[in-house]
Each structure stands twice: as structure tokens, then as C-alpha cells.
Amino acid sequence: MKTSPRRRKHRRRTFRRLFWLLVLATLLLLLWPRRVTLDGLNSPHAILLRADSGEVLAEKDADSTIYPASMTKMMTALLAIEANPDLDTPVTLPEEIFPALQAQNASLAGFQTGETVTVRDLLYGAMLPSGAECCEALAREVSGSEEAFAARMNQKAAELGMTGTHFCNPTGLHDPEHVSTVRD
């Protein structure tokens, strides 16, 4: 049974319409904004931001006080780089920092008492193996003491609008007053 030219033309038109409708539907699905949820996330605190605008896409208890632990080292590294952009500057690890860190079972990068290394080495040691001795050495290099460096950390946090953050040390070792929020 042959189809008439009129019927074939109608089928082609119908096929084209269906094709373009499918293309349009696919584009709408791809471009339509979706609501992001954090329902399946195991963490009690989270925030998801757009990198280009800072817009909050989703959050979960983002303003609750938490202990920042090793996230502290990001502020330590930032201040060390700002204070000393020459990453090849030599720094000697002071003997007095090690006993307290070892007593607290702090994570160490493996540098030795009295060893002279560069600021770059200390930054790597602080950020990669989470070396507390590196953070202490950087703090003393930048501000002279852990306390003065913590004050500088709090000043920088205020400049950055981190209203829920208070630093007590450059390492992130536990202190009940060493706090932050995931929003900060």
C-alpha cells in the first residue's frame, strides 16, 4: 500500500515538530535551575557557594559554632604568605615548640629541632601532612609569638567578615575558645 504525497508531507512535518519539541524539552531540562539539597550529606554542617558570585546554593546548619581544627592552617598559611612573599626565606625551627606539640600528640610534618628550612617548606609541611611544628614556626617568624600571631589571625578574620570565628593558636589544636562556622 502506497502512501500519498500529501500523507508523507504530513508525516515529515509531524516528525520535524516532534524532533524540535524534543530538542526544546532537552534544552529546558539542561538549563532550568535546579534546587540543590544536602539531604544525603552525612556532615552536620555544610555550605555550598557559587565560586564566581559567593551566592549560597545550599546550607546545613552553617552558622553553628564548630571547632575548625586543621582548617586553621589555611589562615596560618595565608598570613605567612602575606607577611613573607619571598618563600625562599630561611626559618629555623625553635627547640621550645616541640615538647608542647608532642605532649598534645599533634600531627607533625617531620622537621627536627633547630633545622633550618624555607618558608615554602614550612607551608608545604603545614598544608600537606598538617604539621603543627610548621605552623608554630611560621607564627613565630611572622609575629614573634603564638599569641601575637593569633591576634593577627583574628584581625584578618574580622577583615574578611568572619564574624563567627575566633582563633587561639596557629595549629588548630583544641581550645574551647578556638571556634568558627562553616559559613566563615
Q: What do the PLM-derived regions correspond to, one by one?
A:
Residues 11-18, 115, 119:
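Structural motif marking the loop-to-transmembrane transition
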Residues 1-15:
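N-terminal Lys/Arg-rich, disordered targeting/topogenic segments
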Residues 30-183:
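Active-site-adjacent loops and short helices of periplasmic peptidoglycan-processing enzymes
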Residues 18-32:
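Hydrophobic membrane-insertion alpha-helices, especially the h-region
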